[in-house]
């Protein structure tokens, strides 16, 4: 479950899933509204919460939100996504007793790296934020967005995470290729295929984290799980199938004025819950269909107007599962 507690942010990052015009003039939801939403989340037995934005640390009451989620609602796993520019000792001190994980987005593995996403390199500030987080006794985590211009930097990012003593996962940049300003950041099929191999060979230890999958996290599924295994609440209370599908036509309801149960019983929820990758274009003939689940439906909409279109990052997943299949076969042969 993603919960966007503010829409305000002082950055304009390429491919940001929460960017919208006028977001910095939008009023933050009240603490009372947020508590109501957290009560709804808790009532559904949701065990993992990601507090996002905007930039959550722009809210002075962020520690109060975390305390309510953890101590009153009993949500066991909580992560805060941050751009890392507003981490302060006072907030960290108030957060430290509630065991959150604070994930900092990096746009480069060194101070000399070009900031393709943010436009301005803040590497030293981000490293300092990670160190402050760890000094406060809070789990730190790095999120690096992979795109065409840094796809060869995966190992350097892993080295950085090990040097700082934190976990890491990688997100994949996603937006339409029709925008001439961002089209150059979209990886080619061959780059994605190579990336699938690189991520597989990193192994489960280096990829373990609160948001990232490991090579052992494999299960059968019909689709990506949007509106069923994942949900996202916008800063105005609107519920969407996932954090990358904040579009009006996919609004499921509003937890500030209604229940989460009603949102999960909406027409939009049923639309997603009836998706089946075995009926998706190209997926039906793929031997990895039942463990891939057709990839990400939000990414499919970046290249096509239909939810049943192929995920444009399919080459990455094919390579990953090819290597998984090979390794599994070798393991069984060794046992025999």
Predicted regions located by residue number:
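Conserved alpha-helical substructure of the radical SAM core
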Residues: 1-98
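Residues that scaffold the ATP/ADP-binding catalytic core of kinase and kinase-like folds
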Residues: 12, 16, 90, 112-113, ...
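Short glycine-enriched, charge-decorated loop/helix-capping segments at active-site entrances
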Residues: 20-28, 115-122, 184-185, 301-302
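Short secondary-structure capping/turn micro-motifs that flank functional sites
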Residues: 22, 57-58, 86-87, 149-150, ...
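Residue-level signal for the nucleotide or nucleotide-sugar donor/cofactor binding architecture
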Residues: 29, 60, 121, 149-152, ...
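Radical SAM enzyme [4Fe-4S]-AdoMet core and its adjacent flexible, acidic
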Residues: 93-100, 105-239, 244-255
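Flexible mid-to-C-terminal extensions adjoining Fe-S/redox cofactors in radical SAM and related proteins
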Residues: 245-336
């Amino acid at each position: 479950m993603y919960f966007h507690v503010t829409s305000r942010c002082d950055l304009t990052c390429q491919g940001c899933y929460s960017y919208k015009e006028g977001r910095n003039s939008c009023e933050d939801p009240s603490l009372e509204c947020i508590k109501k939403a957290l009560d709804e989340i808790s009532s559904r037995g949701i065990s993992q919460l990601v507090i996002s934005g905007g930039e959550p640390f722009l809210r002075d009451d962020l520690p109060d939100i975390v305390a309510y989620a953890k101590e009153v609602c009993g949500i066991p796993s909580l992560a805060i996504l941050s751009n890392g520019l507003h981490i302060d000792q006072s907030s960290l001190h108030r957060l430290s007793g509630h065991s959150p994980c604070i994930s900092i987005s990096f746009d480069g593995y060194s101070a000399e790296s070009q900031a393709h996403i943010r436009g301005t390199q803040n590497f030293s500030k981000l490293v300092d934020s990670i160190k402050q987080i760890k000094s406060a006794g809070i789990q730190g985590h790095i999120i690096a967005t992979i795109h065409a211009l840094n796809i060869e930097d995966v190992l350097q990012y892993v080295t950085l995470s090990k040097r700082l003593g934190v976990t890491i996962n990688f997100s994949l940049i996603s937006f339409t290729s029709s925008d001439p300003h961002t089209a150059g950041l979209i990886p080619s099929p061959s780059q994605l295929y190579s990336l699938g191999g690189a991520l597989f060979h990193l192994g489960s230890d280096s990829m373990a984290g609160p948001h990232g999958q490991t090579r052992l996290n494999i299960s059968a599924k019909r689709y990506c799980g949007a509106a069923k295994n994942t949900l996202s609440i916008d800063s105005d209370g609107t519920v969407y199938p996932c954090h990358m599908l904040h579009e009006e036509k996919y609004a499921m309801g509003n937890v500030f004025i209604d229940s989460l149960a009603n949102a999960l019983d909406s027409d939009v929820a049923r639309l997603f819950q009836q998706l089946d990758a075995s009926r998706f274009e190209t997926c039906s003939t793929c031997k990895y269909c039942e463990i891939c689940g057709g990839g990400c439906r939000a990414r499919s909409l970046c290249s096509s107007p239909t939810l049943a279109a192929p995920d444009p990052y399919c080459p990455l997943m094919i390579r990953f599962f090819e290597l998984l299949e090979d390794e599994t076969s070798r393991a069984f042969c060794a046992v025999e």
